[in-house]
Every structure is written in structure tokens, then in C-alpha cells.
């Protein structure tokens, strides 16, 4: 079963403002967080609830599978469950915004992705150590549910050469997730997940990738890494 793309009523007015080409509306609802990171209210509450229900239904019918990557003990690959077309359509809808925010990471030509659900809570993943993603740009969309803790902490954008360097005090910034709100960041922007204190948090993670960039010349580190000043 393939799940269809989300419809216009599933998205917030903030998304339409952020996608506007005119300067009068451009960026409405888009919030700069730190470095490469931004947040945007994306989905209506009903869309989040429906997506979680669809995921639960698909998981109940699918054979058990391994976690989506080596960092997580829980979660599921959403493409394997049939959500690939929906996520393809979501990336296409966001493409003008990604092109504008991430030109150095080929945001205009993100043509593949690894997409999965992460789950934090009691008897689920409780936190996540610092890391960078195997993506040009990462989309982190909170779908629910009720929870406290499990904040996303950023630790500075680095090239591969300087990935192990300490972050400055200004680079360490934590942000709470809110259901329906999307957080965007460069894949090389280091981050971790703080311990969850109560409830359950479920997020859609999309590692968006550019075949053109990966087959060609990588972006110059000086265009994004502060240690190449």
C-alpha cells in the first residue's frame, strides 16, 4: 500500500507564506534557530494525528523489521511501509524553500532520501548522543504525542575535517519540539537529543540527499564551516 500525498488543507498558512516568492510574504512563520537550523509550523493537528494512525496501521500489517539505522533501537523505515510517495511529494512542495535556505548543499536538487520514524519514551529510545546526519539537509517533523524533555540540541556546523572539534558556547542551543512543527538543518550540523522526561515523542526524520552533489565536487568547507574562516 502506498499512502497518497497530503492535501492543501493538511498544511498551515505559515507554509504558504514561507514559499511565497514575494518579499512581502516570504519567510512568514519561518524562524531562524541557530546556524543552519530553522523551524516552521507545517502540519495541522489533524494531519499529524492521521499520519500517526496510518503508521500504526501499516506497522500492524507489516512483518517486523529492524530499526531504521544503527543509532536507534526503535523506530521504522517509512518508505518500506509505503510512505515514500507522500514524502517525495512533501520534499517537492518544500523544494523552493530548501533551495533558498541551503544553496551550498544543493537544496534545489535534493532527489533522494532515507526517511524514518523515531520514537522516544519509556521502553523506547530515551535519548540520542551527538552526531551528524548522512544527508545534505535533514527534515525533522514532530508528529506527536504528549511529552516533556527530548529537546533537540545543536552543537555547531562543521566540515568532516573538524567534526570532532568542541562547539563554542554560542553554538550549543536547545529547542523543544512541538507537534506539527518542522525543524530543518544541514546534515553536517551536529546535534543530539536530550533525555525524555515523560510521555512519548514520535518524529518523522527525512535525510534528503543530492545525487548531483555526491557524484560531483563537494561544497567548499569555507562556505559553511566556521573553522575555515
Predicted regions and their residues:
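Non-heme Fe(II)/2-oxoglutarate
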Residues: 17-107
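Surface-exposed loop/turn and secondary-structure junction residues enriched for glycine/proline
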Residues: 14, 46, 74, 79-81, ...
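Residue-level marker of intrinsically disordered, low-complexity segments enriched
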Residues: 13, 31, 53, 74, ...
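Catalytic core of non-heme Fe(II) oxygenases with the double-stranded beta-helix
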Residues: 103-228
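Fe(II)/2-oxoglutarate
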Residues: 1-36, 225-229
Amino acid at each position: 500500500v502506498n499512502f497518497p500525498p497530503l492535501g492543501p488543507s493538511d498544511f498551515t498558512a505559515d507554509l504558504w507564506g514561507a514559499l511565497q516568492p514575494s518579499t512581502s510574504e516570504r519567510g512568514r512563520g519561518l524562524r531562524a534557530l541557530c546556524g543552519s537550523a530553522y523551524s516552521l509550523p507545517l502540519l495541522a493537528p489533524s494531519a499529524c494525528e492521521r499520519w500517526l494512525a496510518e503508521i500504526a496501521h501499516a506497522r500492524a500489517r507489516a512483518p517486523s523489521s529492524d530499526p531504521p539505522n544503527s543509532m536507534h533501537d526503535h523506530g521504522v523505515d517509512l518508505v518500506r511501509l509505503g510512505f515514500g510517495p507522500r514524502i517525495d511529494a512533501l520534499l517537492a512542495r518544500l523544494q523552493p524553500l530548501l533551495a533558498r535556505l541551503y544553496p551550498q548543499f544543493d537544496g534545489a536538487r535534493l532527489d533522494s532520501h532515507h526517511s524514518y520514524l523515531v520514537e522516544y519514551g519509556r521502553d523506547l529510545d530515551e535519548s540520542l548522543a551527538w552526531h551528524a546526519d548522512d544527508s545534505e539537509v535533514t527534515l525533522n517533523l514532530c508528529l506527536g504525542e504528549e511529552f516533556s524533555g527530548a529537546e533537540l540540541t545543536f552543537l555547531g556546523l562543521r566540515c568532516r575535517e573538524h567534526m570532532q572539534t568542541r562547539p563554542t558556547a554560542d553554538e550549543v542551543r536547545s529547542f523543544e519540539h512541538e507537534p506539527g512543527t518542522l525543524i530543518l538543518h544541514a546534515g553536517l550540523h551536529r546535534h543530539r537529543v536530550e533525555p525524555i522526561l515523560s510521555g512519548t515523542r514520535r518524529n518523522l526524520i527525512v535525510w534528503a540527499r543530492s545525487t548531483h552533489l555526491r557524484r560531483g565536487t563537494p561544497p567548499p568547507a569555507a562556505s559553511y564551516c566556521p573553522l575555515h574562516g
